[in-house]
Amino acid sequence: MDKVKISIIIPVYNAEGTLDRCLHSVLDQDFTSYEIILVDDGSTDASSLICDRYSSTDPRFITLHQPNKGVSAARNAGLNMANGEYVMFLDSDDALLPYALDNMVDGIGDEDIVVGGYGVFIDGVPGKEVKPAASKSYKGNDYQLFFQENILRNCEMLDSPWAKLFKRKAVGNIRFDETLSYAEDKLFVFEMLCRSSSVLTIPHAVYGYYMRAGSLGSDISSDAHITKIRQFLPKYIALLDTLCTRFPSVPKIQTLYHKDVVGRYLCRILNIFACRRSDLLNEEFLSWVYSLMDADRHLGIFSLRIGQVPNILLYKLRKLPFSIKAYGFMSKCSCSKK
């Protein structure tokens, strides 16, 4: 096989109903300098046979069968096998949009990362698109402008590794964290951003993210989900701290801490605690939550480090809902001044 431009890594687990659509979306691309690495992660349906069928008829398809280890292990196995100059991740229940690969490689120089957009499909019906505002290369001293111009505008673009190209040499030894089962793909993206020095953005939706109506379910309010968030957050915060240290003149990175760590994850936990009883709710857990809020420079009351004590007292007095409402009010007031 000639040297390929892109290695497309597809983890597969019990995807017999969507895998053909996924693979045909790649075969329908005009751009053809790619290999497709199918990592069958212990499927118990017909997915294994589908993978073998494609790899037996097209040399660009490579199939690896392994015992079920999870999506991160499957992606890592694909990374270890990749030969392309760039690697790309595609989930087996999603699809590439028409001309996706052409749009991704058009205008590419030697950037470490290419960031495209995605379209959401709910029960097959096209919905919103999330994509960069313009085609722009951020290199050298301009790399920090990527964060200034993009990190808040559409921060959802950085939640997942798909709709992106990663230079394989830049990836190096970076791998998905196999100890986590929540947001490990987000950590991969931010670790790449921490170690990279150039990004190309393209203003096109290149990836189709397929969802079913109501597929989010009720798991996001379970104690198990809260535990997963607690395992993920310290690693995410460490990466944000690295970016803050590397780019001290980009305040929007700290704003992301305010909006994402505090406004998204911590307030979700507190609101769950305010609505129902939980075995996780204790003084130690709240001390951890409020210590992270204390680190939020956007709220003066927490920069004075008085966030923990009164809220722990409110917890003991069974006044946690009041505490959460007070924090939410202060947070909105703070954001309105920025």
In which residue ranges do the predicted regions lie?
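Catalytic core of nucleotide-sugar-dependent glycosyltransferases
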Residues: 204-213, 219-248, 267-296
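Membrane-interface aromatic/basic loop that binds lipid-linked glycans or pyrophosphate carriers
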Residues: 271-338
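A conserved acidic beta->alpha catalytic loop
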Residues: 25, 40-49
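Glycine-rich, basic loop-to-helix element that forms the pyrophosphate-binding segment
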Residues: 66-82, 103
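Short beta-strand/loop segment that forms part of the nucleotide-sugar
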Residues: 33-42, 62-67, 91-92
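Short aromatic/hydrophobic "clamp" motif used to bind/position activated sugar donors
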Residues: 87
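N-proximal low-complexity "stem/linker" segments adjacent to membrane-targeting elements
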Residues: 1-27
